[in-house]
């Protein structure tokens, strides 16, 4: 059978039949002929026909005539590709439409069942699959039925091109024309009725439902090249959509490319030739023309959608058309199950007549993109692609919408649709009920509503599992191509518009529904989401706090203690190392938790009254009293505790300090010398340096008094230098001060002021910086900064912090300490049994209470090392030469074998 298609005579006839079509249509076909020749060279059926000769003339003539149609279609398509989008495109698309219809009529007259199944299943793939045994004869019949009046059909195609071009130009050239085609039932409903009445239900309905002229024409094009090429080129020359993708695929749907490559010997054979006799190898055609397999399988069942999806992902045919075919295959699978095909056509005819005039012209009017989707609609005459994509009338149009988006019908129309979708957002709500009504009316006009509803319910029920797989595969098919991702993103508005039809929103896009519903109700849902997010954020902040809060707390605390950072800009505090500051925030939360834990531990003694209410037991009152008294308890040097008797002295001292500061302020404001603080300073320093009173001073509020002494006078002059020096030293010697004390006393602000003051002395500034560093490190959760300390400072700090061990008293049953020297010298006799303090056992040595803080002195004399170093430096050349000489001698000694005397001479025995 391949020899029939690929015979040399057949190829010659094809070449002869194609040239008049080129002459009739345009002179631009020269370039296209060259392109065709170039395409035909690699795997053209002509070469194959030369290799594979056959003598069957009937098939040859049929294939010749069929190829004439296909070459005409190729020329039309190639002309469509190269021509500017003008009336010639319309003619070509119309020609493809008319040729589709005429070929359908011829097919209906010749072998409506077989050939239309072939066409319906895209005549390249489905003949192979619907009539695998007659796969060669039926396509031949099909091409014969088309080729019987091939020349006439071309003439009719040209005439119909003129007529439809007139119709198209009369009716917005492609919007109204397909709408009329579809609305007049002559092109849509008539074929659809033929489909319904004849076995064409599978084929044309599949064409119609399966985007017949992206899918079916893509394969009809194989058999009716004029259908396929215009269809795909209407679809592919849908001017941006597929050309971009088909240009990317280097062969408008592998089928047009193969057609062009084979000079349209039969665009079915070209595909067959390209796919190595796709009739013989239908799986290859299925692989290459996933749309061929898809329609027959769609006719067979709905589960094939999964396979078409995969095929379409794998097939390089038009990533977009393959997905259109895929989405269309869902249509076809759903619509081929019953008369819903006719209903879909009726719907699409009416809906397209209305909505294409509404949506499509609006979306496509600004450019030739009218032809893009419309050529698709026209190419399929059933206008399943464009209508289904343009109109959410069918529940499947969710998928076509995705197919339209995936096909990126045209990137420009897409953009226009985006814009129009926003512009027509007011009309969307009106259109949707209209479209729903239109959906219902065509269903009623074509057949009863219940058939579609029952079918759709059955589909939903039967395909509920398949649809999930479809959705996943759809997503994989869609997301596999970046163009499709862009298309899907760009068609978001369109999807939202399409999916707003609650009646028709099948589970095809079940996973996308919530997103698209959110898009439709974006104005409400976004506000709700914002409110929710705000409330959640507030709740989270209340429950857990936030980093900004913690940072603000630290900043506020620092501001409370040391004042605002912007008060004086003369000198900034640079006490912290960078690595310390980097770790601040991470440590603060932990430290706060530790502080909270410490507070809770310290409060363990007190039963928290907040939990128990205001009721306090006698025990709690007693604990409170005890706690209030504990502030006055101090540790003595020997570890004993005592209640300070110096509280009255401390309080009197603080009173005097405050009075002196107040008097100095008054004197300064009255322009008199303020000497009260200076006269009192020696007494204050004397008391503040008493180690046992320091904590008492701090508890009694000496920090606020020191702050009064360090603050500038009313005339902004600093207190006396001696006062500043002495008090800063005392502050440095005071034990650690709590944050609360620092905060309430205001000492931090006074010290910071001195630190930043330009007239403060450098030693005082250094002390002030150290104080600020020491006080602020606990706030940021930092430990002592040992890096900033010198060795002496570290040693001094260790000595100061060395714990004062309680010395074991020699009273009680403990062994009195004896002086070992006296025992050894005999001055003190060793204890004997019966003596007090005697132990009749070996005594365990007492643990050492020594903290080895001070490093022991190095007892080794360093002079020897120094001498060696100096001697090394002072080595003379003579010594070096002598050493070398000695080394050479040593080497030479062992340079030769040791001679052993057999007689035993010279043996060191």
From Swiss-Prot:
Keyword Transcription in annotation: yes
PROSITE patterns: TFIIS_N
Signal peptide (UniProt feature, chain positions): none
Chain segments carrying region Disordered: 1-615, 786-820
Cellular localisation: Nucleus
Primary location group: nucleus
Any one Gene Ontology cellular component term annotated for this protein: nucleus
Pfam family name, one: Med26
Residue ranges of every copy of the TFIIS N-terminal domain listed in the record: 704-782
Entries under InterPro entries matching the protein: RNAPII_TF_IWS1, TFIIS/LEDGF_dom_sf, TFIIS_N
Region (2 X approximate repeats), start-end ranges: 451-530
Sequence repeats: 451-470, 511-530
Family membership noted in the UniProt record: Belongs to the IWS1 family.
PANTHER family, alphabetized: PROTEIN IWS1 HOMOLOG (PTHR46010:SF1)
Main function: Transcription factor which plays a key role in defining the composition of the RNA polymerase II (RNAPII) elongation complex and in modulating the production of mature mRNA transcripts.
Name this polypeptide is given: Protein IWS1 homolog
């Amino acid at each position: 059978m391949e020899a029939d298609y690929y015979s040399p005579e057949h190829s010659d006839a094809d070449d002869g039949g194609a040239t008049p079509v080129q002459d009739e249509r345009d002179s631009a076909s020269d370039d296209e002929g060259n392109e065709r020749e170039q395409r035909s060279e690699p795997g053209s059926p002509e070469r194959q026909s030369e290799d594979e000769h056959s003598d069957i003339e009937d098939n040859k003539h049929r294939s010749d005539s069929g190829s004439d149609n296909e070459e005409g279609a190729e020329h039309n398509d190639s002309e469509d590709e190269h021509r500017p989008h003008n009336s010639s495109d319309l003619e070509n698309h119309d020609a493809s439409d008319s040729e589709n219809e005429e070929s359908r009529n011829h097919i209906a007259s010749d072998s409506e069942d077989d050939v239309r199944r072939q066409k319906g299943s895209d005549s390249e793939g489905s003949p192979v699959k619907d009539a695998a045994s007659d796969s060669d004869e039926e396509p031949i019949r099909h091409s014969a039925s088309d080729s019987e009046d091939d020349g006439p059909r071309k003439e009719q195609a040209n005439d119909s091109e003129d007529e439809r071009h007139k119709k198209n130009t009369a009716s917005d050239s492609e919007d109204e024309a397909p709408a009329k085609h579809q609305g007049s039932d002559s092109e849509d409903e008539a074929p659809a009725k033929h489909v319904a009445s004849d076995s064409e239900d599978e084929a044309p309905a599949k064409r119609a439902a399966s985007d017949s002229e992206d899918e079916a024409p893509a394969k009809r094009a194989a058999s009716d090249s004029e259908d396929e090429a215009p269809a795909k080129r209407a679809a592919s020359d849908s001017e941006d959509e597929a050309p971009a993708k088909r240009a990317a695929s280097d062969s408008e749907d592998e089928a047009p490319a193969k057609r062009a490559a084979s000079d349209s010997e039969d665009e079915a054979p070209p595909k067959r030739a390209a796919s190595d006799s796709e009739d013989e190898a239908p799986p290859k055609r299925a692989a290459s023309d996933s749309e061929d397999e898809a329609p027959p399988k769609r006719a067979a069942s709905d589960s094939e959608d999964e396979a078409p999806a995969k095929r379409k992902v794998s097939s390089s045919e038009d990533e977009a058309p393959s997905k259109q075919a895929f989405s269309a295959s869902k249509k076809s699978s759903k619509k081929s199950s019953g008369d819903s095909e006719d209903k879909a056509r009726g719907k699409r005819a009416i809906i397209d007549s209305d909505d294409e005039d509404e949506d499509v012209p609006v979306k496509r009017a600004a450019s030739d993109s009218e032809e893009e989707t419309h050529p698709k609609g026209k190419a399929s005459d059933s206008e399943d692609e464009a209508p289904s994509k343009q109109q959410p009338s069918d529940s499947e149009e969710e998928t076509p919408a995705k197919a339209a988006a995936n096909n990126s019908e045209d990137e420009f129309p897409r953009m226009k649709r985006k814009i129009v979708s926003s512009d027509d957002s007011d009309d969307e709500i009106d259109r949707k009920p209209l479209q729903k009504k239109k959906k219902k009316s065509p269903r009623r006009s074509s057949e009863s509503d219940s058939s579609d509803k029952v079918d759709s319910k059955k589909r939903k029920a039967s395909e509920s599992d398949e649809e999930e797989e479809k959705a996943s595969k759809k997503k994989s098919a869609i997301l596999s191509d970046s163009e499709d991702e862009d298309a899907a993103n760009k068609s978001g508005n369109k999807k939202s518009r399409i999916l707003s039809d609650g009646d028709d929103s099948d589970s095809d896009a079940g996973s996308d529904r919530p997103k698209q519903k959110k898009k439709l109700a974006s104005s409400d849902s976004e506000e709700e989401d914002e409110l929710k997010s705000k409330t959640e954020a507030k709740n989270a902040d209340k429950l857990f706090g936030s980093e900004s809060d913690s940072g603000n707390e630290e900043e506020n605390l620092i501001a409370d203690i040391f004042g605002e950072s912007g008060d004086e800009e003369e000198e900034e505090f640079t006490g912290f190392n960078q690595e310390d500051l980097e770790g601040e925030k991470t440590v603060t939360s932990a430290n706060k938790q530790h502080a909270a834990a410490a507070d809770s531990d310290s409060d363990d003694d007190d039963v928290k009254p907040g939990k128990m209410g205001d009721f306090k037991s006698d025990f709690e009152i007693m604990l409170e009293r005890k706690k209030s008294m504990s502030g006055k308890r101090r540790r003595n040097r020997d570890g004993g505790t005592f209640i300070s008797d110096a509280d009255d002295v401390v309080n009197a001292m603080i009173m005097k300090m405050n009075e002196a500061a107040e008097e100095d302020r008054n004197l300064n404001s009255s322009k008199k010398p303020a000497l009260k603080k200076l006269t009192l300073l020696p007494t204050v320093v004397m008391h503040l340096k008493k180690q046992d009173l320091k904590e008492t001073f701090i508890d009694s509020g000496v920090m606020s008094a020191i702050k009064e002494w360090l603050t500038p006078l009313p005339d902004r002059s600093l207190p006396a230098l001696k006062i500043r020096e002495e008090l800063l030293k005392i502050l440095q010697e005071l034990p650690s001060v709590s944050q609360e004390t620092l905060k309430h006393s205001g000492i931090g602000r006074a010290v910071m002021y001195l630190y930043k003051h330009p007239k403060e002395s450098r030693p005082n500034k250094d002390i002030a910086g150290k104080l600020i560093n020491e006080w602020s490190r606990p706030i940021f959760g930092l430990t002592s900064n040992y890096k900033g300390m010198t060795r002496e400072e570290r040693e001094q700090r260790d000595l100061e912090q060395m714990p004062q061990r309680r010395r074991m008293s020699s009273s009680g049953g403990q062994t009195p300490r004896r002086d070992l020297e006296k025992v050894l010298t005999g001055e003190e006799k060793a204890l004997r049994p019966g003596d007090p303090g005697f132990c009749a056992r070996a005594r365990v040595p007492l643990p050492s209470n020594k903290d080895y803080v001070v490093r022991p002195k190095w007892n080794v004399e360093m002079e020897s090392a120094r001498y060696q170093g100096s001697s090394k430096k002072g080595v003379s050349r003579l010594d070096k030469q002598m050493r070398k000489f000695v080394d050479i001698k040593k080497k030479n000694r062992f340079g030769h074998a040791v001679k052993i005397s057999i007689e035993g001479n010279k043996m060191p025995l």
